[in-house]
Every structure is written in C-alpha cells, then in structure tokens.
C-alpha cells in the first residue's frame, strides 16, 4: 500500500470535471443509502461504520478492537455486499500457516506432463476479514501484513498481484485476554485506523435482541461497485486542504513523541514510543475522506480532531509509569488534542 504524499501548496480542487462532480454527488447521496442498508442488519455503531467507510474510501486498512460477539463479521460482510466486493473471512488460529492465507503450489498432471499449479488462497479477494489476527503467531501475521503493504504475494519466487480494490479489516481481542500474540509496532503502523468497537447501550442492545429473534434480517442490496471505490480513492486525494491544517496534523503527531522539542511533559512522563510520519499522512487523508462523505470539498480542523483517536491509539506505546498511574492511550490522545493549538486559535 503506497503512502499518500501531500503537496506543500493547495492541491488540485475536487470535482474538476463533470465526471468527477457526478461521482462526488453519487458518493454523497450513496452514504445515506449505505446507512439504510446497514440498518437492516446492524444496530448502532455509527462511529465504527463511519471510520470503516473513511478507510475504505482512502485506500487504507482497519484494525477493529473489541470483545467477541459484537457483530464484527456481520458488519464487514454487509459492507462488502453493499460495494459488490468479493469477500473472504480468514479465522486466525495458533496453527494457521502462511500458505493457508496466500496460497500454495501443487503438482498436477496435465496433457503436457506434470506441472506446478498455484492455488490461490483466501487473500485473493477485495475485502478480507482477518478474524482474531492476534490469535496466530507472528510469522503467519506477517504473511497477511506483507500482502497489505505490497498488494501482492510471492510463492516459489513468482509474484501474484492481488485484486483491486484490496481492503483488510483485522479484528483482535483485547491483549489482556489469554492466548494472544500482540502485533509488533511496525506492523500495527500499516493499519490506517484502530477502530474501537464497544458494547452497545442498553436500548440498542434491546433493539438487537428484538430484531434478531423476531424475523429474518433484510437482504442487503448492492449500491456501488469495486470500480466506484477506486474512483472514490482518486476523488478523496483531490480534496483541497490548507497548509495550516497539514501543519496541525504534523504537530499533533510530533507531540506524541517523547523527548522531542515540542513534546508536552505528560508525553515524556507516560509515553515510550510515539507516532511516526505515517500517522500525519493518514490524519490528512482520512480528513479528506470525511469531508467528502459529509458533502464538503474542504477539510476542517474538526475532521482531524475527530480522527485523531483511531489514527493514534495503536501508534502510541505507553510506559510502565502510565500504567501504574492508570493512564491509557485514550487519555494521552485527549491530552494531546488539548495541548496542541488548533490553526487560527
């Protein structure tokens, strides 16, 4: 997955052609239809849905953190149906091997004799749900993460290009649960967002029980196609963003790094490792997608603030002192938003 590179001045405005304008209008109108379709099977989780859509339209990948039984699989599968994308679910287990993900070569008899034939694994799809990715050892985790980065896999020295669009949503159980293999920081950094999926409020949970015990869920109707998603990738990158907002994203990211010049005192006290440059890139790119989804052709500081938590929470590593004092990543992100001055303030 190539990283976005923001130009130093004003980007090309969005909707520069009639075709672009029509695509933007379809995207804006389609968001309401997406919510309507998902409401047939999913109750609540609006913030989770918004963040997944932003990542999908930005060309990024998502890590979803939450306890089992929160309808993560149903949500991802439903989104794949809405966009008419080929969907595959990979259940990560301690004995899962890299070839179980990428595919393997087998010896097959043909009219010309025996030949090695590559049998594609489940990674050859448009939308992958990597379920409980932290249940499998690092070697197998790396097989999927390599495919995420390169959009290709290699078997017996032969490269096999993955289908586009290629979007991975990996779920993980909270790291304090038994039998987990935490993802290394360098691999976590490949995910655009870490989306927190929490238990529903009582009223929404009551609605889930009523809905799932009274009737069969409605059928999800496709709204967009894979070609539409690729077009939206281009449109998102055309959304203009002011340089002072880019600087705000960069300063917010840099402030998370301990022992740096502009690091607040609480970062030096509580953080072992801060966010890298990729965080700033994803903040700006995600802000562009959020603006476009809301019908705006410009980015605001609120877009960046709203996405700070999903972008930063898996890129900041707290130290033992923070744990002893009961401080977590969410607390640090909130403090960063208070400490870093917004543009024009």
Regions found by a protein language model. Give the residues of each.
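C-terminal engagement/docking regions of AAA+ P-loop ATPases
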Residues: 2-21, 259-345
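Pre-Walker A (pre-P-loop) alpha-helix and adjacent loop at the N terminus of AAA/AAA+ ATPase modules
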Residues: 23-70
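Conserved alpha-helical scaffold flanking the Walker A/P-loop in AAA+ ATPase domains
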Residues: 51-54, 107-129
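Walker A/P-loop
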Residues: 56-94, 107
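Walker B catalytic acidic pair
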Residues: 66, 131-132, 143
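P-loop (Walker A) phosphate-binding loop of NTP-binding proteins
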Residues: 67, 101, 171
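Canonical AAA+ ATPase core
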Residues: 108-113, 136, 140, 148-238, ...
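AAA+ P-loop NTPase domains with strong preference for DNA replication initiators
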Residues: 210-299
């Amino acid at each position: 997955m190539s990283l976005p590179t923001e130009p130093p001045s004003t980007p090309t405005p969005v909707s520069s052609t009639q075709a672009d304008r029509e695509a933007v209008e379809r995207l804006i109108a389609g968001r309401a239809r997406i919510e309507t379709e998902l409401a047939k099977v999913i109750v609540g989780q609006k913030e989770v849905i918004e963040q997944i859509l932003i990542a999908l339209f930005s060309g990024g990948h998502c890590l979803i953190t939450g306890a089992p039984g929160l309808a993560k699989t149903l949500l991802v599968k439903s989104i794949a149906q809405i966009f008419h994308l080929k969907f595959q679910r990979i259940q990560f287990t301690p004995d899962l091997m890299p070839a179980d993900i990428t595919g393997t070569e087998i010896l097959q008899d043909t009219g010309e004799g025996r030949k090695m034939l590559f049998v594609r694994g489940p990674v050859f799809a448009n939308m992958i749900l990597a379920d409980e990715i932290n249940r499998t050892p690092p070697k197998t985790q790396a097989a999927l993460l390599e495919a995420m980065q390169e959009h290709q896999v290699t078997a017996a020295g032969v490269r096999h290009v993955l289908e586009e669009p290629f979007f991975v949503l990996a779920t993980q159980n909270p790291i304090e649960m038994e039998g987990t293999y935490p993802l290394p920081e360098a691999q976590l950094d490949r995910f655009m967002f870490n989306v927190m999926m929490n238990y529903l409020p009582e009223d929404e949970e009551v609605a889930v029980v009523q809905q799932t015990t009274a009737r069969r869920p409605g059928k999800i109707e496709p709204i967009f196609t894979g070609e539409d998603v690729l077009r939206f990738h281009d449109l998102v990158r055309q959304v203009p963003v002011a340089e002072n907002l880019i600087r705000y994203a960069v300063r917010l990211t840099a402030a998370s790094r301990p022992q740096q010049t502009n690091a607040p005192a609480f970062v030096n006290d509580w953080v072992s490792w801060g966010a890298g440059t990729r965080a700033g890139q994803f903040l700006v790119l995600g802000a562009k997608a959020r603006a476009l989804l809301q019908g705006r052709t410009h980015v605001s500081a609120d877009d960046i603030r709203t996405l700070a938590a999903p972008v930063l929470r898996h890129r900041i590593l707290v130290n033992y002192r923070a744990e002893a004092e009961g401080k977590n990543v969410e607390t640090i992100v909130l403090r960063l938003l208070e400490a870093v001055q917004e543009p024009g303030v």
